[in-house]
Amino acid sequence: MKHYKKAGRVFWCHLAETAVLGALLLCVGTVRGHRVCTQHDITRIPDTSFQSYAAPAAADANGTGQKIVCLTFDDGPSSTTPLVLETLRQKQVPATFFVMAADNNRKYLPLIQTEADNGHQIALHTASHEYKKIYQSPESYWQDITELLQAISPYTDTEKIRYLRFPGGSTNTVSRKYGGSDIMKCLKAQAQEKGYRYIDWNVCAEDAAGGHPSAEEIYCNILREAQNQTVCVVLMHDTAATKNTAKALPDVIDWFREQGYRFCTVEQMDRLCTQSPPNS
């Protein structure tokens, strides 16, 4: 993708917003017969409590008031993942991959080893990504996580994985349909008991939207939500259906770099913190 002309790209972003938001209302998503995150399922009010502990760390970093950005990718690996990894390599930027292990992406699981070998963080998302299955009960959710850990264990040291992202986010409401109104409260408490940290996001690429948003739209979505943020945790996807995310990624990285952000994995962000994260 060619870099957009700086003078015009912000103006274009505003023109694109109406079309993008309209597409979000029509989201129903499958990738080759398998359910993945869609904007319909993703919470519109994510838990952004990480900002309360990461912002002081950013302000104190080297005494410069440096800003922090974590690039995160859900629902991979897939055929898109090598494109993402190549851009990250070229730009020398770390990322966090919240991986899954469904039937349709099993052949791509060896890419998890490549991600880890390249210094990226591996974190847990889901094995099946079937909301009805995983959110039926706490037992069903943790069984899914166990299946995920077993599937990825040949490619990474699962004993070191202490971070996860709930499908749909920790404040999603779709889970209530299957596990009742307290299912997420219960799962978050159990995650803490098991020594996991869960994290949502405060910048959403909206790349799982119906209609497959263009690279320009994805770029604009990120730019819009990142404006004036000291700490950004960016939600993106590296599925077979989100190759436009890979196309947008070079410009996304360049923009954050131009704005003076420091790139971190989620774990690195925690290490910078001046106090313990709220769900540690």
Kindly give the residue locations of the regions a language model identified.
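Terminal accessory/targeting
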Residues: 1-70, 86-95, 154, 202, ...
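Catalytic domains of cell-wall/extracellular-matrix polysaccharide-remodeling enzymes
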Residues: 129-235, 239-255, 261-262, 268, ...
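Generic structural signal for hydrophobic
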Residues: 88, 115, 190-191, 256
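Residue-identity detector for glycine
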Residues: 8, 22, 29, 33, ...
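Active-site beta->alpha N-cap acidic-glycine motif
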Residues: 38-163, 271-272
